[in-house]
């Protein structure tokens, strides 16, 4: 499973290094070094704006998601909502594999949608990982703390 946060940088051409730990997880836990990268679901911020990062799906996890979206039944979505999800998540998706040095290329359309410029953060989310600009991550993380304070019943229910 993907765990932890890893700070790194991305250059002007969109090259960055996939954390070694995440490369290990792809192969050891998911059996494939390939993955898909796409837009994450936007997070609504308290000021009414939105923040968005990218999400990395292990290859087989992505194929399972595509199958659900292809069938479309049982998801509780209207055909318009399903089409919207496909446009936001499936259409911009790219298949990736790190090179021998662990580098990946984040294409321009994904860098733009996630506001990735220089300092970025890889975030482990168990069966997937996220990529955030440092600035956007700080906004989202601050909101998470406000939404789930230390005495939150949600956290207590999870035993945290």
UniProtKB/Swiss-Prot annotation:
GO terms under cellular component: cytoplasm; nucleoid
Subcellular location: Cytoplasm, Nucleoid
UniProt entry tagged with the keyword Mitochondrion: no
Primary location: cytoplasm
SUPFAM superfamilies in the cross-refs: AbrB/MazE/MraZ-like (SSF89447)
Transmembrane segments annotated in the record for this chain: none
Keywords, in A-Z order: Cytoplasm, DNA-binding, Repeat, Transcription, Transcription regulation
Top-level taxon: Bacteria
UniProt GO MF annotations: DNA-binding transcription factor activity; transcription cis-regulatory region binding
InterPro entries the UniProt entry points to: MraZ (IPR003444), MraZ_C (IPR035644), MraZ_dom (IPR020603), MraZ_N (IPR035642), MraZ_sf (IPR038619), SpoVT-AbrB_dom (IPR007159), SpoVT-AbrB_sf (IPR037914)
Boundaries of every SpoVT-AbrB domain copy: 5-50, 93-136
GO annotation (BP), single: negative regulation of DNA-templated transcription initiation
Subunit record text: Forms oligomers.
Family membership noted in the UniProt record: Belongs to the MraZ family.
Name of protein: Transcriptional regulator MraZ
Underlying gene: mraZ
């Amino acid at each position: 499973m993907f765990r932890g946060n890893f700070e790194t940088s991305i250059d002007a051409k969109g090259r960055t290094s996939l954390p070694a730990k995440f490369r290990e997880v792809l192969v050891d836990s998911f059996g494939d070094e390939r993955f898909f990268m796409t837009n994450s679901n936007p997070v609504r911020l308290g000021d009414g704006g939105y923040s968005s990062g990218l999400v990395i799906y292990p290859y087989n996890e992505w194929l399972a998601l595509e199958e659900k979206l292809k069938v479309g039944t049982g998801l509780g979505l209207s055909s318009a909502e399903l089409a919207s999800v496909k446009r936001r998540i499936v259409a911009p998706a790219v298949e990736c594999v790190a090179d021998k040095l662990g580098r990946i290329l984040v294409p321009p359309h994904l860098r733009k949608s996630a506001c990735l410029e220089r300092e970025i953060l890889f975030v482990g989310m168990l069966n997937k990982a996220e990529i955030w600009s440092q600035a956007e991550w700080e906004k989202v993380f601050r909101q998470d703390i406000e939404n789930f304070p230390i005495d939150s019943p949600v956290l207590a229910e999870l035993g945290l």
